[in-house]
Amino acid sequence: MISWELILALAVYNFIMYATPGPNNSILTASGIKFGFIRSIPNILGIPTGHGLQLALVCLGLGSLFIKYPILFDVLRYVGSAYILYLAYKMFGSLNISKTEDRSRPLNYYEAILFQFVNPKAWVICSTAVTLYYPKNENILVGTLFMVVMSTIVNIPSISIWAYGGSIIRQYLVMRS
């Protein structure tokens, strides 16, 4: 049986990890500024979907590969960092809030899912959460489902704040221009 103490501890951990600055929240803030909250919703929904898949893989044993072959995490870190720099260039380089025609678009649902697999912070969140909060005496499927559901429930409101904050900044910038 999963205790209320474990549920509360995992919820607090998830909130702290998802609500603090990182690649996802930077992209969501930029998306909120550039495109507004509504157009950022596919990105907001793709992040917990991708992170849930990633977390399930770690719960089901992928994390042991990182322990056995630490170079995999180094490769992931460099590839992820390069991709994050590319996205930063793309997003922040195009933060023009003009009323003229603009072909840029926010990350879509599938791009947000895939981004989780090159996001170093997301891998750290998964590895740490499974190490500290995985319910030890549960069936592997029940434990994995618990971790993924808890992650998703906390993730969506925690990251939505960043896109909403970006949309507030957008309103201010539009008023000033």
Give residue ranges: language-model regions:
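Hydrophobic transmembrane alpha-helices of secondary-active solute transporters
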Residues: 17, 115, 154-155
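Selective transmembrane alpha-helices of multi-pass membrane proteins
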Residues: 67-96, 154-162, 170-177
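Flexible cytoplasmic inter-helical loops of multi-pass small-molecule transporters
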Residues: 93-107
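Short loop-to-helix capping motifs
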Residues: 22, 36, 119-120, 175-176
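A short amphipathic helical element positioned immediately N-terminal to and/or at the very start
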Residues: 109-117
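Juxtamembrane transmembrane-helix termini in multi-pass membrane transport proteins
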Residues: 2-71, 128-147, 163
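Selected transmembrane alpha-helices and immediately adjacent juxtamembrane segments
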Residues: 116-126
